[in-house]
Amino acid sequence: MWNEGWMAAAAIAVFGLAGCVKGMVGLGLPTVSMALLAVFMPPAQAAALLLLPSLVTNLVQMRPVAGLRPLLQRLGWMQLGIVLGTLGGVALWGGVGSLPAARPALGLALVMYALWGLSGLRWQTPAPHQAWLGAACGLLTGAITAVTGVFVVPAVAFLQSLGLSRPALMQAMGLCFTTSTLALGAGLLWQGQGLGAQAQEMGLGLGLGLGLLASALMLIPALAGMHWGELLREKLSPELFRKLLMLSLLVLGVYLCF
């Protein structure tokens, strides 16, 4: 049986590993964390621990700040679409887990996209169509986020089609994931499914305050792992980086299917 000491040590190790994956390929912290934490704690407790590490690592990924303005000018409509799609999805369907068939269907789509990406085929979105396609992609990403809690589809595919440099792609993913996290958090808070509710489900009398404290403590291993992952990423060739990103999406897709 897991006692509290072993659970804390295991959670620290999980967030360190998840942060490393995040630093290397720009995504995967929620997936790795939830998959491994579920081995020794309830999903509600795992989700509560994940809140701040997910948000803060996405904010860190958005640096450097100087590059945000041109990125926002290019992706502003997409961010608006993400917010509207997420809030609308929560209002219409009731939030994450409300449509059980959505997760495996999304997983299958993600597997197909990852296999296509690993084949070496690529496409680019023409500049005149990037604004409206970005808004449409944002709406769809937001709607999918609302019912599955997954931010990457089809946002990552669209961002890859823009022909961004590797640093710009990492920053763009950080921006989109931050927008999605905040929008989903706002929607769940509105529906009464936020961190305080999760803490109450876990039987924690201190509710929101204790949940935030536990989540804040997991920031240390997550950020340390992310820094190490970023150092490893600098040693990767662009082609190897792209393959690792596609493999990460493939693993995420398989995880969602089951």
Regions found by a protein language model. Give the residues of each.
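A helix-boundary/kink motif common to multi-pass secondary transporters
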Residues: 42, 97-98, 165, 237-241
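Transmembrane helix exit motif
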Residues: 58-69, 90, 96, 105-130, ...
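Selective hydrophobic functional segments
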Residues: 48-99, 182-238
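Hydrophobic residues within alpha-helical transmembrane segments
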Residues: 13, 17, 52-59, 76, ...
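Hydrophobic alpha-helical transmembrane segments in multi-pass integral membrane proteins
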Residues: 46, 88-93, 143-150, 184-187, ...
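Cytoplasmic-side transmembrane-helix entry/capping segments in multi-pass membrane proteins
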Residues: 70-82, 103-107, 128-138, 168-175, ...
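Structural signature of hydrophobic alpha-helical transmembrane segments
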Residues: 7-8, 13, 37-55, 100-110, ...
